[in-house]
């Protein structure tokens, strides 16, 4: 009985050591995926900046884990989200990526859809940049949005990626 416990403990220690070594060698970085690129934006109402708007960003990896982040607009109506990264075995599996993305605004008891799309790649900047720019990381642009609460939600067709629905316009 003691021999079985000893083997179990030894195997556990070895697995922990191997996992730690693999992690420190950066092998898991090959599974790194960008779920939502960096976003800078400003919220206005009839062209005037709006402070105190709750901004909610969500992304979901292939119908799996839902990531949700919240911020508030500043006095100039500005908001910012860093790029959102995760790790997924799907990066090396031959399956079409699908990352639903949303940005929602809450202000004075109302909700406004700012951005709704599905990202079909795991590249940073993959929502709005060409494949050439993403592969070379040259001229990679963050997402820069102007979102007016008085605008109607519209469909925006893109040259790269899926259409985007919402009140936000690219800058």
What are these regions (language model features)?
Residues 1-9:
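Bacterial N-terminal signal peptides that target proteins for export
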Residues 31-44:
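A short, Gly/Thr-enriched small/hydrophobic beta-strand-prone motif that recurs across taxa
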Residues 48-59:
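Short, ordered, surface-exposed loop/turn motifs in non-cytosolic proteins
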Residues 2, 22-33, 91-171:
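Feature of secretome-associated and extracellular-like proteins
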């Amino acid at each position: 009985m003691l021999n079985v416990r000893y083997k179990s403990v030894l195997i556990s220690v070895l697995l922990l050591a191997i996992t730690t070594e693999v992690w420190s060698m950066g092998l898991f970085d090959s599974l790194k995926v960008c779920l939502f690129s960096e976003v800078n934006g400003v919220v206005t109402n009839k062209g005037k900046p709006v402070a105190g708007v709750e901004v909610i960003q969500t992304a979901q990896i292939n119908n799996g884990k839902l990531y949700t982040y919240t911020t508030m607009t500043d006095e100039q109506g500005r908001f910012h989200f860093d790029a959102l990264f995760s790790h997924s075995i799907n990066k090396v599996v031959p399956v079409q990526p699908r990352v639903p993305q949303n940005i929602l605004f809450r202000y004075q008891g109302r909700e406004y859809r700012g951005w709704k799309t599905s990202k079909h790649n795991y590249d940073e900047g993959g929502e709005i940049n060409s494949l050439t720019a993403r592969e070379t990381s040259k001229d990679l642009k963050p997402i820069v949005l102007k979102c007016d609460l008085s605008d109607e939600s519209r469909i925006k067709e893109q040259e790269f990626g899926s259409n985007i629905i919402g009140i936000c316009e690219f800058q």
